[in-house]
Amino acid sequence: MESHHKWGIAFIAAGLALEILFPVLLVFDTILIVVGIALILFGGREKKIEGVS
């Protein structure tokens, strides 16, 4: 598992945990979850782009 996958899972877990514990922080939790998903989806792009060049 690569580093960006680990960080993505950590951000998603933190966002979900904060959402359950502190529902008032909805915007902050949503941002953490979106960043985590983006890390998982787009984290390895630079390796793929360098390989094509």
Swiss-Prot record:
Cellular-component GO terms for this entry: membrane
* Membrane topology, as annotated: Single-pass membrane protein
**Membrane-spanning regions, if any?**
20-42
Does the UniProt entry include the keyword Transmembrane helix? Answer: yes
Q: Which UniProt keywords apply?
A: Membrane, Transmembrane, Transmembrane helix
Q: Where in the cell is it found?
A: Membrane
Q: What is this protein called?
A: Uncharacterized protein AF_0870
Per the UniProt record, the source organism is Archaeoglobus fulgidus (strain ATCC 49558 / DSM 4304 / JCM 9628 / NBRC 100126 / VC-16)
